[in-house]
Amino acid sequence: LKFGANQLHETNTYRLVIDNEKDLSGLPQGVIATAAETAKENGLEGKWVFTLQNPSIMPFLQYADNRNLREQIYKAYIDRGSQDNAYNNWANISKMVSLRVQKARLLGFPDYASYVLDDNMAKNSENVYQLCNRIWEAALPISRQEARELQKMIDKTGGRFKLAPVSYTHLRAHETP
């Protein structure tokens, strides 16, 4: 319960405040209007506010031309619950893992994965690993090709950076069919 509450708090309280209209480049007008309304609701009239809520962050990652700002909001999203503050989830994660191990052992299983998989089609972790490896072998060449194509897009448009997760959504939105 505490884990989810911490994640929710960090999602609900983060604000990326933009005060330079140039930083809105690439964003659709509707997204900009919503960010202006969010800013107004937060007492920041004349600015634009983006949050970690999906209707705000997703179009920002997809359309914003400013890579540094995309990186900033992306990092805030993936780092929720891991900041050095009262909402850090590391202790909660450790406790959850410990309790899962205890539960599994009390029920006669060597570990939590064995407990969960016992009632599933996979039956055991070895079968899961085999399936994952088969998928991995098929997906890896395709993923590498896709990464090469996206890096070519970056290079072609004068980008001086290597492909990173923060750029994926943006590049996909701007690629030509």
Q: Where are the model-predicted features located?
A:
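His/Asp/Glu-rich acidic catalytic environments and adjacent acidic regulatory segments
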Residues: 1-123, 138-142
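Generic hydrophobic/packing signal
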Residues: 116-118, 127, 173
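Zn2+-dependent metallopeptidase catalytic core
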Residues: 128, 132-143
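Carboxylate/His-rich catalytic cores and anion/metal-binding grooves
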Residues: 139-154
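Single conserved hydrophobic/aromatic residue that forms the stacking wall/gate
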Residues: 170-177
